[in-house]
C-alpha cells in the first residue's frame, strides 16, 4: 500500500513539474512577440525601396525582385536582397547607404528574386544577423555560415528588433514570413511576395498586434484577384504601397480605390512615418 502511494506521489510530482515547464515555455514564447508597452515612445520609421522592378528614380537600376531598408533609431534592417547583388549594391551606393551600416537581414521566402543578392551583400558585410524561415534549404544556411554571419531560423511570430516583428512562417507554397512594424501612426506590414495570400497575412498581422487596422501594407502582393482590393479596405488596411509582383492592372485598381492613400512604391521611394505625418521622398 505504501509503495502504491509512493508511486502515485511521484507521478503527481512529475506531472506538476511538466506542467510548470510547459506553462513557463508558453509564457516565454508569448513574451517574445508582445508589442512594446504603450508607455514606450514609438519611433519614427523610414522605409526605402532599394530593389524593385518598379522605380521612381531613373538614376537607379531596376530588375525583377524586391528589397527595402527599414530604419529605426536603433537599427537598420534589410528586408530581402533582390535577385542580384550587383544591382542591390549599386543602388545602395547611389543612395549613400553603406552596407556596413545594416545590422540585420530578414528574408521573406526562398525565391531567387528575394535572396539572390544575399551572397554578394555578405561579402561586403558579414557582421549581420540573417533571419530566415525555418523551412529554408540547407544551401542558404551554409552560405550564411560560410560568410561567418549569424543566423536565426523563424517558425513562429517573434520580435526582430525594437518595434519590429516577424509574422512567423506562414504556409505558401513557398512558406513566407512578413515584417510588422509598430510605428507612430499604427502597424506597418511589409510583404515580400505574399505567397500565403495578402489577406491571410493581414489577418495574421492583426491577430499578432491585437488591433483592428493596419496603417500601411507595402510590398509584393502576388497579383491577387481584383476583389482583394476592396477586401483589404474592408478588413482595415488604411494605406497601400503595392509593388514588385502585384501586377500593373492590380496596382491601377489599388490607385483608383485608395486615391490619396495609395503610395507609388519602387526603387528610390522613401516613406517616412512620423507622429504627425507620412511623407514621401525620392532620391
Question: Across the structure, where does each feature detected by a protein language model lie?
Answer:
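Zn-dependent metallo-beta-lactamase
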Residues: 5-74, 156-169
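Active-site neighborhood of phospho(di)ester-bond hydrolases with catalytic His/Asp-centered motifs
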Residues: 78-81, 103-110, 131-134, 189-193, ...
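Active-site metal-binding motif and surrounding structural segment of the metallo-beta-lactamase
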Residues: 86-131, 206-216, 233
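Metallo-beta-lactamase
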Residues: 132-177, 183-184, 263-282
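C-terminal regulatory/interaction regions
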Residues: 4-10, 25-35, 245, 249-283
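Cap/insert and terminal regions of metallo-dependent hydrolase folds
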Residues: 117, 187, 193-274
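Short, structured coil segments at secondary-structure junctions
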Residues: 95, 126, 146-147, 235-236, ...
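Conserved beta-strand hairpin/beta-sheet module of binuclear metal-dependent hydrolase folds
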Residues: 48-94, 176-191
Amino acid at each position: 500500500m505504501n509503495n502504491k502511494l509512493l508511486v502515485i506521489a511521484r507521478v503527481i510530482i512529475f506531472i506538476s513539474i511538466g506542467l510548470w515547464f510547459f506553462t513557463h515555455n508558453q509564457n516565454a514564447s508569448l513574451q517574445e512577440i508582445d508589442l512594446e508597452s504603450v508607455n514606450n515612445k514609438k519611433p519614427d520609421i523610414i522605409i526605402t525601396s532599394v530593389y524593385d522592378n518598379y522605380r521612381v528614380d531613373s538614376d537607379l537600376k531596376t530588375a525583377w525582385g524586391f528589397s527595402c531598408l527599414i530604419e529605426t533609431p536603433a537599427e537598420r534592417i534589410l528586408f530581402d536582397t533582390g535577385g542580384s547583388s550587383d544591382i542591390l549594391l549599386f543602388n545602395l551606393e547611389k543612395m549613400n547607404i553603406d552596407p556596413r551600416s545594416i545590422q540585420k537581414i530578414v528574408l521573406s521566402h526562398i525565391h531567387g528574386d528575394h535572396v539572390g543578392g544575399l551572397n554578394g551583400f555578405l561579402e561586403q558585410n558579414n557582421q549581420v544577423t540573417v533571419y530566415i524561415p525555418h523551412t529554408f534549404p540547407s544551401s542558404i544556411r551554409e552560405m550564411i555560415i560560410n560568410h561567418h554571419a549569424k543566423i536565426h531560423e523563424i517558425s513562429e511570430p517573434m520580435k526582430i528588433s525594437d518595434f519590429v516583428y516577424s509574422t512567423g512562417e506562414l504556409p505558401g507554397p513557398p512558406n513566407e514570413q512578413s515584417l510588422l512594424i509598430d510605428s507612430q501612426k499604427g502597424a506597418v506590414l511589409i510583404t515580400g511576395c505574399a505567397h500565403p495570400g495578402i489577406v491571410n497575412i493581414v489577418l495574421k498581422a492583426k491577430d499578432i498586434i491585437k488591433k483592428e487596422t493596419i496603417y500601411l501594407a507595402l510590398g509584393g502582393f502576388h497579383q491577387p484577384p481584383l476583389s482583394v482590393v476592396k477586401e483589404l479596405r474592408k478588413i482595415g488596411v488604411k494605406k497601400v504601397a503595392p509593388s514588385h509582383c502585384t501586377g500593373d492592372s492590380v496596382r491601377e485598381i489599388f490607385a483608383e480605390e485608395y486615391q490619396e492613400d495609395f503610395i507609388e512604391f519602387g526603387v528610390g521611394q522613401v516613406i517616412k512615418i512620423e507622429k504627425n505625418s507620412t511623407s514621401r521622398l525620392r532620391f
